[in-house]
Amino acid sequence: MKNILIKDKSDLDGVEEFIPNAYILGAMEKPNLPSEDIKVLSTKFSKVGRTTLERFPNLEWVVYRGHGTDSINLDMCSQHGVGVVSTNPNIEGCSHWIKDKLKDGETIIFGNGSISKRLQQLITDYHVVDSKTKIIHIDDEYKNVVSCVSLNQSTEDMFNYELFKNMNDVNFVSISRAKTHNNKDLVKLIEENKLSSIFIDTLGTDVRDELLNTNKVTYTKHMSWDYLGHKNDHKKLSEIIQSCLDDNVENPILSRRKNQWF
């Protein structure tokens, strides 16, 4: 019996060799399979919330092939007793991509997840702000501002005029979702020379043109993921999925418990 569903197959070339007993679907493909059999669901882009959890009533684990959890409704998963674990892919590529975009001088890093922690090992002269810490504005002592935060209610529009207003000639580097940036404010900050350069690596394209028209913004689509040429680790994914089936998951984002239905 197949009890594994892997969605968003764009990063999955050759995964069948490592996980032969799985259903594998693209992001837009509808699952035509016995949904009650699925115990482990792995996603990269697809959202996991009420619809998914009700479609797969016996789901036990979600294995997220990304960073952060903004596409996973953790509250809903918790209510349904479904555990969540991340493969934390592309840490090396993302952290080195950020490092190579930094200018001389002190750096402030927003977010303290796996990519941020690896970046901290690669650089000196930095200060870290946990995403739970609310900062209204940054003092003019840093030359680089780095965003590694996930998108949630508290980080939406986080990088705005108020945050940067006391700074001058600053380099901003972000791998966060597009909605964490207030693009109109970023344009204003560039016009006032508070920001001298911006590097954003994300799939979002919201009002991207007005940023690019400043000629001071480099906007790429997840180039950092493959920055060092590392391929996706199918063996690691296979091992994590097996640990879910064995109910022996290390360092889950959310622990599994017996399903709690409404």
Pin down the residues of each PLM region.
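C-terminal helix-to-coil terminal segments
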Residues: 14-15, 86-97, 197, 204-262
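Rossmann-like adenosine-cofactor binding region
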Residues: 49-52, 132-211
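Phosphate/diphosphate ligand-binding glycine-rich loop within oxidoreductases
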Residues: 39-101
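Redox-cofactor binding/interface segments in oxidoreductases and associated redox assembly factors
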Residues: 6, 41-43, 64, 146-147, ...
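N-terminal glycine-/charge-rich "phosphate-binding" loop or analogous flexible N-terminal tail
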Residues: 1-38, 126, 135-137, 260-262
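Hydrophobic beta-strand scaffold residues
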Residues: 24, 83-85, 126-128, 219
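Glycine-rich adenosine-cofactor-binding loop
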Residues: 95-124
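Short, Asp-centered acidic motifs that coordinate Mg2+ and/or phosphate
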Residues: 38-40, 61, 143-144, 171, ...
